[in-house]
UniProtKB/Swiss-Prot annotation:
The keyword Transferase does not apply. Pfam families: MgtC (PF02308). The gene is sapB. It comes from Bacillus subtilis (strain 168). This is Protein SapB. Coiled coil: none annotated. GO terms for cellular component: plasma membrane. Keywords: Cell membrane, Membrane, Transmembrane, Transmembrane helix. InterPro entries: MgtC/SapB/SrpB/YhiD_fam, MgtC_SapB_SrpB_YhiD_N. The keyword Phosphoprotein does not apply. The lineage of its organism: Bacteria, Bacillati, Bacillota, Bacilli, Bacillales.
Length: 232
């Protein structure tokens, strides 16, 4: 059988749409300086689309010659599992116990899913899903922050303080409250291994309040020797 270089225009259309979808998702992540970029998303979407095309076409092509029954969606099912490993690679646990990369991991899985849908010929469904994903990631959080509960208007800061006198801990917490710095978690380290007792506090403040301002407020409290602040 002679090798033919002819490619079905419908296949080229599917690959082109998958490229466009991957480009949109990749740009959204790259503009936010996330580990998932433009090239990665395009590769995932196009590869998923291509493997879906191969799987479906092979399932209906080879039985004519070899009488082999094949599941047209067997290969795409393995894509979802394989992409999961890539998604796990962008989930990070930072030193301040904050988990990041979950949305990026979900976007990887989404790019693969949209590539599968495109490869199977569901163009309109793929574009509709892309639109809903972008609305959910970009627009919906802004709306929720505007009309949602006050908790969404706050941010968490972890403060580690060295104290000159362990008997002033309660007074320091009361003074923090007067300065509108609400503590919701307190940890005390006074095992005698350090020169000063340590108090670690997780606080909530308005999201527009600078972490440096919180630092200055804590530093000004009587009995506080040293301060370390981390925005969570």
């Amino acid at each position: 059988m002679l090798l033919s270089w002819y490619i079905d225009p419908d296949i080229l259309l599917k690959l082109g749409i998958a490229t466009l979808i991957g480009m949109v998702i990749g740009l959204e992540r790259e503009l936010k300086n996330k580990p998932l970029g433009l090239k990665t998303c395009i590769v995932i979407a196009v590869s998923s689309c291509m493997l879906t095309i191969v799987s479906i076409n092979a399932a209906y092509h080879f039985p004519k010659y070899y009488r082999i029954m094949m599941d047209p969606l067997r290969l795409p099912a393995q894509i979802i599992s394989g992409v999961g490993f890539i998604g796990a690679g962008v989930i990070l646990r930072k030193s301040n116990d904050v988990i990041s990369g979950l949305t990026t991991s979900a976007m990887i899985w989404g790019a693969a899913g949209l590539g599968l849908a495109t490869g199977a010929g569901f163009y309109k469904e793929a574009f509709a899903s892309l639109l809903f994903i972008l609305i959910s990631v970009e627009f919906l959080p802004w709306v929720v922050r505007k009309i949602g509960p006050d908790r969404l208007q706050e941010k968490d800061i972890r403060i580690r303080m060295s104290l000159s006198d362990k008997d002033k801990m309660t007074e320091i917490l009361k003074e923090m409250k007067r300065r509108d710095i609400k503590a919701h978690s307190v940890r005390i380290d006074d095992l005698g291994e350090k020169d000063f007792p340590i108090m670690e506090v997780k606080v909530r403040v308005h999201k527009n309040r600078y972490t440096t301002d919180v630092y200055y407020d804590i530093k000004a409290i009587e009995g506080v020797v040293g301060v370390k602040c981390d925005t969570l």
